[in-house]
Amino acid sequence: MKNYIAYDFETTGRDARFDQVLQAGFIIYDQNLKEVKKLNIRSRLNPDTVPSINALKVNKLNISSILSEKESYYEMTLNIHKLLSEFKNSYFVGFNSINFDEEFFRQILWEHFLFPYLTNTNGNLRLDVFNFATMVHAFRNNSINVNKNESGKINFKLENLAKSNNFNFQNAHEAIADVEVTMKLMKMLIDRNSDLFMNFTENSSTKKVEQRIISEKIFTLHNYLFNSHRVYLVKHLIKHPIYKSQLIGFDLKYDPAELIQYDHNSLYEVYKNKSFFRKIKINKQPTILDRKYASSMEPYLEFTEEEIELKNQQLDNKQFLENLEIVLKRESEEYAENKSQEIPYEEETIYS
């Protein structure tokens, strides 16, 4: 069974390539969510880093304190690495971590000449509790309380979820406090939705996600964008010919009968300007579920099984799939041609 390595960073800004981690909180939990080890650590501000005023306000830090911390950024990184080197086959858990904390994590390891991909190698996987919370709310909204903001839109910020679900959270944006609340939230959701948690953990494996999508052919895809849930019933089409971590699907609320007859030039125009297609990044823990979830919701509820199956068969058209592959290659080539020709700074070359 896997341990859970829950973590959170407080930083000088939002740019993982140039900003710095000022606070790092790590708590190791066993398979029963009992605490095993804890690391709460800070670093001294690097002389070449200018912190964002907004970041300092959010994190309740001042310049004098971050300039007088005992440990350097390098020393903090070594302490983190020493702790984590004891653990393998673990889940790295965070809140909105795949899009934020993980990029900082990789950057600080890489900049200090350490292997940067700890979270998804050596049997390790990633669990982003933000994805779990939004998934649960989309399909079982009585399992989690979510407040609305001043504009009347649902709000999934960690401190707001803590308040609406009655968690004690006195030190929001203190790294170790954020870790503790993230795990409280995950435990509450597990207790109420053990089946969805199983689904959530399976989505953390790139290999399992790909196998599931290919084998099931039709599935539910959930995204949370711009303060709203987006639920799609999707038919898997092909793997991206250039970007191997992307699968391409078709939104089954649309009729493909005419589309499959297009040549690749006409299809390219549709691909660019319409929302028929869905890109699934299988290495970013996408929210993939059984087709029954989307099938029970509008607009897919209006279609019969026979209508869905007809679309499924139409989209298996060999010439259409070959044309789609041409379209994807063309898109990739145009992206490469339009990409900035400026030589990147060294800090920006982690994926080069």
What are these regions (language model features)?
Residues M1-L114, T119, N155, E159-N165, ...:
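Conserved non-catalytic scaffold segment of RNase H-like nuclease domains
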Residues T11-G13, N99, N131, V181, ...:
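Short, glycine/acidic-enriched loop or turn micro-motifs at the edges of active sites
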Residues L83-L84, H173, L237-P241:
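A general structural signal for short secondary-structure junctions and capping/turn motifs
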Residues Y91-N96, F100, F104, N142-K207:
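Acidic, Mg2+-coordinating catalytic module of metal-dependent nucleases/exonucleases
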Residues T121-K148:
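Short alpha-helix plus adjacent loop in nuclease-associated cores
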